[in-house]
């Protein structure tokens, strides 16, 4: 069995048809792909319904990011989950390098790639409002495989049994900081998190929930709660 046949890509869509097209064309048909469509977009369902390696889950309402990820994970028939935003471009061997790391660091819980923005600048998640300052990482991103205290939800690989054993994402967190919460629970329960710089993605940003006024307003509201 190839490593591709052991992995399910789980991606959450909210009016993201154009981004999904690019993502799906960029990966092998040997992967299982699960799209959770939080926008009930008929065009998304119509576009991809004829692909045998791809499943589309259409909940009756917008579940939020974490709950949608959990739904996709439970529908997976593979051993590993690669959660990835639809607006991510995967560089060559990104998933393979993450998978190889998972075989090398057996005690670890999850693996994140090096993330670049659309201009090629690296974005490194080194801290969180949910972490104490002592757990904040250096401003200098890792240049080799390294343990980290938090990973970004935009792209990471995890063994399905490990993800489900802690209940997945906290479904009470609708859209923001659910990856920080997951990172903390994984570190405390399963094992360390790793950043793998040889695995590279470009995160174009914004397309998983198209840059609509209602999404911008929702994000502003959630971020404002941090400072209350």
Task: Tell what function each PLM region has.
Residues 6-8, 32, 181:
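Cell-envelope/extracellular polymer assembly enzymes that use nucleotide-activated donors
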Residues 11-29:
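Short, well-formed alpha-helical segments that are part of the catalytic scaffolds
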Residues 24-61, 71:
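Acidic donor-binding segment of Leloir-type glycosyltransferases
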Residues 59, 84-86:
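Catalytic metal- and UDP-sugar-binding loop of GT-A-like glycosyltransferases, i.e.
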Residues 61, 67-71, 89-90, 97-167, ...:
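Acidic/His-rich active-site region of diverse nucleotide-sugar glycosyltransferases
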Residues 81:
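Short aromatic/hydrophobic "clamp" motif used to bind/position activated sugar donors
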Residues 175-181:
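Acidic donor-binding loop at a coil-to-helix junction in glycosyltransferase catalytic cores
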Residues 183-184, 188-226:
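Active-site-adjacent helix/loop segment of glycosyltransferases
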């Amino acid at each position: 069995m190839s490593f591709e046949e052991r992995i399910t890509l789980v991606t959450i869509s909210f009016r993201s048809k154009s981004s999904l097209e690019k993502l799906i064309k960029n990966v092998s048909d040997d992967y299982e792909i699960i799209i959770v469509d939080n926008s009930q977009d008929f065009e998304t369902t119509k576009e991809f319904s004829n692909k045998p390696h791809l499943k589309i889950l259409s909940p009756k309402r917008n579940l939020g990011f974490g709950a949608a990820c959990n739904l996709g994970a439970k529908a997976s028939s593979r051993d590993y989950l690669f959660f990835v935003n639809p607006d991510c471009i995967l560089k060559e061997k990104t998933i393979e390098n993450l998978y190889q790391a998972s075989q090398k660091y057996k005690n670890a819980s999850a693996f994140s790639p090096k993330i670049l923005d659309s201009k090629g600048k690296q974005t490194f998640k080194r801290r969180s409002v949910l972490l104490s300052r002592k757990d904040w990482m250096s401003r200098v991103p890792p240049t080799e495989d390294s343990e980290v205290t938090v990973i970004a939800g935009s792209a990471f690989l995890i063994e399905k049994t490990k993800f489900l054993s802690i209940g997945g994402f906290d479904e009470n967190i609708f859209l923001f900081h659910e990856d920080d919460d997951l990172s903390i629970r994984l570190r405390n329960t399963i094992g360390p998190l790793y950043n793998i710089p040889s695995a590279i993605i470009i995160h174009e940003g914004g397309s998983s929930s198209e840059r609509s006024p209602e999404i911008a307003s929702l994000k502003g509201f959630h971020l404002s709660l941090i400072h209350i």
